[in-house]
């Protein structure tokens, strides 16, 4: 057991270093950019988004970057989304509302909605964004300036995650921990290794010519995790993508409460693991060994496990402070967070892997 405890301690020491390197080397959107430049087509799929769609639309219409068109694909919403979009389109001609059609065989709903939006778009740059996002007024201009400066095919913008309530504060930091602690994201910004491709519904901005060259969303028509798939497709073609911190400009509350988090990630976590039962099992075992077992052994007074818990805590405090998350949850919630995501992994594997049926936003589809 001491050998295992030593391995876990070394692994967390490396994770601590990796977190520091990522925080130092993942660039922020620094350039404010001008008000003019190439036409940017913002494409938003909206399915039953009455809760925040108006905030999102108004944030994009308030951008200081003037050469912008906003395309929202109303993906057959059954709530007030359509009425909210009609009202805002009547007030500003830059908002184009498309009424989404039923997906053809072989297509999932979101990639089909994005594909429809891309066919209508006229922009040299395409910005794919989810429907529950707030962008500060200079965000689009800053993203365009960074892409032009660095000559990349695609940029992914990382947000600030708004959290309220117990389970959101416990579970949602896993997304940031994955990017900043588990992955060498800084290395992905300097290579075209496909497996380091990171995409996000909070902002994938891509040059039209590169989007078309990789086949657009038609090449991702059955992708459950289409945003990550887009980044990896770009990288597989030999093109560069970069990740930028935009947590001072972009914010969203992704899910409201633990049940929404559970349901939301049930639909796509197994897909994110490559639909591999082996990888799902490995992630569960690793989650216990590297993230929960040290806390259990620390209770017995095992010295290296106590040191591991200290390293985990310092790593979380450092990351949470940088991202402006609540520090009290950094101190104690790590094993509970990992246990929660273990449950999500099991549920996602069962529902989408074994049963192969997903219900989301009032729609059922084959996983």
Language model segments and positions:
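N-terminal membrane-anchoring/stem segments of glycan-assembly enzymes
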Residues: 1-36, 173, 185
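Long helical/loop segments within the catalytic core of UDP-sugar-dependent glycosyltransferases
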Residues: 17-22, 96-119, 142, 146-213, ...
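Short, well-formed alpha-helical segments that are part of the catalytic scaffolds
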Residues: 21-29, 49-62
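Membrane-embedded multi-pass helical conduit in multi-pass membrane proteins
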Residues: 34, 279-355
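Cell-envelope/extracellular polymer assembly enzymes that use nucleotide-activated donors
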Residues: 38-41, 69
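Acidic donor-binding segment of Leloir-type glycosyltransferases
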Residues: 57-104
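Acidic donor-binding/catalytic loop of UDP-sugar-dependent glycosyltransferases
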Residues: 80, 129-146
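Catalytic donor/gating beta->alpha subdomain of glycosyltransferases that bind UDP-sugars
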Residues: 147, 154-181, 209-212, 217-279, ...
